[in-house]
Amino acid sequence: MDPLVGIIMGSDSDLHVMQAASDILKQFGIPHEVTVVSAHRTPHRMIEYATTAKDRGLKVIIAGAGGAAHLPGMVASVTVLPVIGVPIKSSNSIDGWDSVLSILQMPNGVPVGTVALNAAKNAGILAAEILGTADEIISQKIADYKTSLNTEVLEKVEQMKKDGWENKFD
């Protein structure tokens, strides 16, 4: 099946973070592609990737970048697809703040949906939710996933009670 989500990153050094987006999309059974597209080192590749994405069948692009983190915004500027930005705390970043602010502070007309620092898993979930608006099977998988999160927390609450931690809520 052709990919529905593109996962791109500025460098292969970002793969350890962006892997989480791929993992959650696999869990939901959503076909996707993963590659390196640098806004600074391969600008022509970036433009070609973004401008051909829709015609290639992609519905959402997840773009991760560290440092100056121009990739998500530049991709968003040349595609009509939703772009989800993942700020990455890199070796040359200012504790990740430069990446966060570069992706968050986009001008009017060029939105980038932004997740937390290194939160590629949430980017994958958000991409799945976007796809789920038009696909009931994906929507149900997301609902099941969220139910499992609820169950997991309630099991931990019960374990805490068994371990002697009391509260007046339960």
Residue ranges of predicted features:
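Short beta->alpha connector loops at strand-helix junctions that form conserved
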Residues: 9, 36, 65, 86-89, ...
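Glycine-rich phosphate/diphosphate-binding loop of Rossmann-like nucleotide-binding domains
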Residues: 2-41
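Short glycine/serine/threonine-rich phosphate/pyrophosphate-binding segments
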Residues: 14-18, 42-46, 65-74, 93-97, ...
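Helix-adjacent hinge/juxtasegments
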Residues: 52-98
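C-terminal binding/interaction regions
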Residues: 3, 9-16, 20, 96-170
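Short, solvent-exposed amphipathic alpha-helical segments in soluble enzyme
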Residues: 21-26, 51, 78-80, 129-131
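Amphipathic alpha-helical hairpins
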Residues: 5, 31-55, 64-67
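Proline-centered loop/turn at the N-terminus of a beta-strand
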Residues: 4, 82-87, 110-111
